[in-house]
């Protein structure tokens, strides 16, 4: 088998939900190592790609995190409130543009020098979202608002 040969074929999709984002069921054939094609089906949730940033202060040795309510976590037995880095969906912006805006919206800090760290898929077994991770140094002078966004 050639490295560039297709390993997936005959993809069919069925829309299951588009209430908030898109949930689809895909049926496809996957080429196995023994050369046989095997039909499989999977559901995939598509909510778009996102970006995450960890703000740090080297001098104070601190980071800025936000506290947000996450309903899916709540229905899994947790109180629903998570401590996390500022993040948001790209919504047609570049990862760099979006994360600068999200950092200010959620934390109140306006950062200008962001550094990409890595990209990763959130939960690749069922979600299409790719996350772009960044870091940025902040100081007290970078504070332009209370932040908050949707954070509680």
Each predicted region: which residue ranges?
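Phosphate-/nucleic-acid-contacting segments
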Residues: 112, 151-152
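Acidic pyrophosphate-coordinating catalytic loop
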Residues: 15-19, 74-76, 120-132
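Active-site-adjacent beta-strand/loop module that shapes the phosphate/pyrophosphate-binding cleft
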Residues: 27-34, 123-144
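Conserved Nudix-box catalytic region and its N-terminal flanking loop in Nudix hydrolases
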Residues: 42-45, 54, 59-101, 118, ...
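Acidic, metal-coordinating catalytic segment for phosphate/diphosphate chemistry
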Residues: 15-60, 74
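A short coil-to-beta-strand element that immediately follows conserved catalytic motifs
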Residues: 8-9, 110-117
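Beta-rich strand-turn-strand
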Residues: 92-97, 106-113
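A short, amphipathic edge element
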Residues: 1-14
């Amino acid at each position: 088998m050639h490295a560039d040969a297709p390993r997936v074929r005959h993809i069919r999709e069925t829309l299951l939900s588009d209430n908030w984002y898109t949930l689809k069921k895909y049926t496809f054939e996957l080429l196995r190592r023994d050369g046989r094609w095997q039909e499989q089906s999977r559901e995939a949730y598509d909510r778009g790609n996102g970006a995450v940033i960890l703000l740090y202060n080297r001098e104070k040795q601190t980071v800025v995190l936000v506290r947000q309510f996450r309903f899916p976590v709540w229905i899994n037995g947790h109180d629903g409130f998570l401590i996390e880095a500022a993040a948001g969906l790209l919504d047609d912006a570049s990862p760099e543009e979006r994360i600068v805006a999200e950092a200010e919206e959620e934390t109140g800090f306006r950062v200008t020098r962001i550094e990409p760290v890595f990209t990763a898929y959130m939960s690749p077994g069922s979600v299409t979202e790719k996350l772009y991770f960044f870091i940025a140094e902040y100081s007290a002078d970078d504070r332009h608002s209370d932040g908050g966004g949707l954070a509680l």
